[in-house]
Amino acid sequence: EPEISLMHVSPEFSNSYEIICWVSKNLPADVVLVVKENPRSFGIRSREYYDRLRKISNVELAQPDTNTKEWINHSLFTVAISGTSGFESVYYDKPVLSYGKHQIINYLPTVYYVSSFLETRATINELLCLNKKSGDLIKSKTVLHNALMSCSFSLPKLAENEKSDFLVEEIGAILADRLYNQYVEKI
């Protein structure tokens, strides 16, 4: 499994192919599971991996560089192991089927952590019957937003600094000085 975040956030559940099979087997016949690879991971997996996915009748592969927001907005719910898709789904008022045991979003009322095929089946049935007008979607988004804002800080000149190499050069010089001083002191 090339997705490095799976090994850190969900070491006990890192087989994405198995999860895709579980979800696809439990969806109604008229529902398609769209699988979107992280653009940075695309091409790392073997061709056989993608060929196996294409053989599953209700699975479609999205272009890795497509906008995630569009897929989430058109979904009934999203499936996440780790990464940002679960967080984005909460922000876009969509429930999440989570396989990442240690994801902080699992504490939100519209995120459903599962760890087995039977839990997947029961939770998908629950998600398909979920009242989309429920206040839980707004509550989840508000709680997540407030939690993120409470541990964030403002970077008012970020856009200005991104256009300049100054910050990179300055940080590089500081790090070079530190390395030099460490080695000089040891000699």
Label for each model-derived stretch:
Residues 1-48:
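Conserved catalytic-core segment of nucleotide-activated headgroup transferases in glycan assembly
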Residues 47-62:
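Nucleotide-activated donor-binding/catalytic signature segment of Leloir-type glycosyltransferases, i.e.
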Residues 60-63, 111-123:
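Short acidic-hydrophobic, aromatic-tinged amphipathic segments that line or gate anion-handling sites
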Residues 64-111:
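A donor-sugar binding/catalytic signature common to diverse glycosyltransferases
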